[in-house]
Amino acid sequence: MTNIRKTHPLLKIINSSFVDLPAPSSLSTWWNFGSLLGVCLAVQILTGLFLAMHYTSDTATAFNSVTHICRDVNYGWLIRYLHAIGASMFFICLYLHVGRGLYYGSYTYSETWNVGIILLFAVMATAFMGYVLPWGQMSFWGATVITNLLSAIPYIGTDLVQWIWGGFSVDKATLTRFFAFHFLLPFIVAALVIVHLLFLHETGSNNPTGIPSDSDMIPFHPYYTIKDILGFLIMLTALSGLVLFSPDLLGDPDNYTPANPSITPPHIKPEWYFLFAYAILRSIPNKLGGVLALVMSILILAVIPMLHTSKQRSMMFRPLSQCLFWLLMAVLLTLTWIGGQPVEHPFIIIGQTASMLYFLIILVLMPITSLTENYLLKW
């Protein structure tokens, strides 16, 4: 008698995706982040569902409803901080996952990579709208500043902004629609994750060497299930540590003040995971130019497969490209730091230099370095 997991219409799909899936034997810890992102998404949907049971999306009561969750709901403080810090964990895993793809050349699976970029945009949109919901000072002013950027679009910009706001300023209509979209988007993300996996399983996983591994495959279960569970434990320990010991470490103190349209905070800034893009936006004095640079800072990922000039897929055996990759990481960390600083000397020039380097490394230096390595290896 054949095993039910191999014959049942539903179970055999799960079996071929998570149990009997042939996987390269050399996958390192950098391949753990896909499953960690799945756990993050599950945690966010669950905690978000419980928060939505108590939250009210009205400008008069939104801030108080969040306070009520933290003070009066059983373990409401725990659910709220798991959700807030869970978002930070989500982005840490997301950026490491994308970084892994860049380093090991996973972007050559173009369908998987492109769905991944759409996923990144969807998660960023979800996080932005979620940050508006507590209706604190930074929520309100963050929403005002970021949505107002769309007014830089020629001809339709102003109408578009008013359409998104549902009026002439960020108000009740804006908060209500942001809550509706913030609730809906994670389920769209979950559907896109299935598409992402579907495309990945068409080709099979990449591996650290970038060399086809068809001759050396092992079953996903038990080898990588055990490895993934270890990853879950480490991440959930870090999440619990932050939630229980320093829940406000990654937040902004201004968000403990109710939204007030007549008082502008001294430094308007988004959550830490958007600071690199915010720094690129601020480094260009022109509004439309800044918006284009902001969008391109993420959309540039779609161009990377076309700029792959190396004869090797992975950077594992390419020391010059490795140096450039880590320089790019240093530039991104610098941008993240600059995004949280006030707009004054010397932060302005540092931000502009780092922004220029970011695009220069990806668009010019990496392809040239790859060609140089080909030449040095006489390929």
Swiss-Prot record:
The chain crosses the membrane at residues 33-53, 77-98, 113-133, 178-198, 226-246, 288-308, 320-340, 347-367. It is found in: Mitochondrion inner membrane. A ubiquinone binds at H201. It holds the Pfam family Cytochrom_B_C. It is a multi-pass membrane protein. Keywords: Electron transport, Heme, Iron, Membrane, Metal-binding, Mitochondrion, Mitochondrion inner membrane, Respiratory chain, Transmembrane, Transmembrane helix, Transport, Ubiquinone. One of its GO terms (biological process) is mitochondrial electron transport, ubiquinol to cytochrome c. One of its GO terms (molecular function) is metal ion binding. Component of the ubiquinol-cytochrome c reductase complex (complex III or cytochrome b-c1 complex) that is part of the mitochondrial respiratory chain. The b-c1 complex mediates electron transfer from ubiquinol to cytochrome c. Contributes to the generation of a proton gradient across the mitochondrial membrane that is then used for ATP synthesis. The cytochrome bc1 complex contains 11 subunits: 3 respiratory subunits (MT-CYB, CYC1 and UQCRFS1), 2 core proteins (UQCRC1 and UQCRC2) and 6 low-molecular weight proteins (UQCRH/QCR6, UQCRB/QCR7, UQCRQ/QCR8, UQCR10/QCR9, UQCR11/QCR10 and a cleavage product of UQCRFS1). This cytochrome bc1 complex then forms a dimer. Belongs to the cytochrome b family. This is Cytochrome b.
